[in-house]
Amino acid sequence: PVQNVGAYGVEIADVLTEVELYRRDTGVREWVRSADLELSYRYSNLKFTNKAVVLGIRLRLRNDGLSAPLRFGELARVLNVSVNEIEARRLATTVRAEVLRLRKKKGMVYNPDDHDTWSAGSFFTNPIVSPEVVQHVRTVVEKLHGADDAAAMPCFDASGGRKKLSAAWLIERAGYPKGYPEDGPARLSTKHTLALTNRGSATTEDLVELARTVRNGVEKTFGVSLAPEPVWVGVSL
């Protein structure tokens, strides 16, 4: 719940009811309603503070054996959900197996023998921007990569009339493909552009340098600033 994790159209906020906290300043343990955590995209009011430790959570889950509505395009496609099936659901066990398969394919399930999984998961959050910024980015993409690429740019509705862009898509269009840089101790995953990985000998400095290079390159190209998803300790970008 600290950063309201989620994937494929569902996040912890959808099922979280309460969180048990240990207040470090008072030593008090208490249960707090999820509504009091200000949950939003990859955020809660616990994220950038060390005042409390999460000891436990309570979830409200379904008991009918079915998944949440399959609204995320990639997952819906592999489960053969058509665009006409509004609020379609499938067996939860089937959906879970498919999600794990997709995550493994992207190097997001840890495997000690696969350096593409040596990461903190998605490193940058997808930027939430105004419609005007979306149009600017689309114009830049058209100049750099052509009209077809600009028309296919991923863009999703967010709260307050804003839009959510794909950080991975922007990173690749800014010139940083999967596996970048080819000989670096810290590289973008060869399976998923958003993961910054340790190839076996990377230091904190190597990771920070790569993160800064990617962030600065995207901002220079598109005027969009990418924010890191993991909380940093003792270092900043």
Language-model region placement:
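Alpha-helix capping at helix-to-loop junctions
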Residues: 7, 21-24, 59, 63
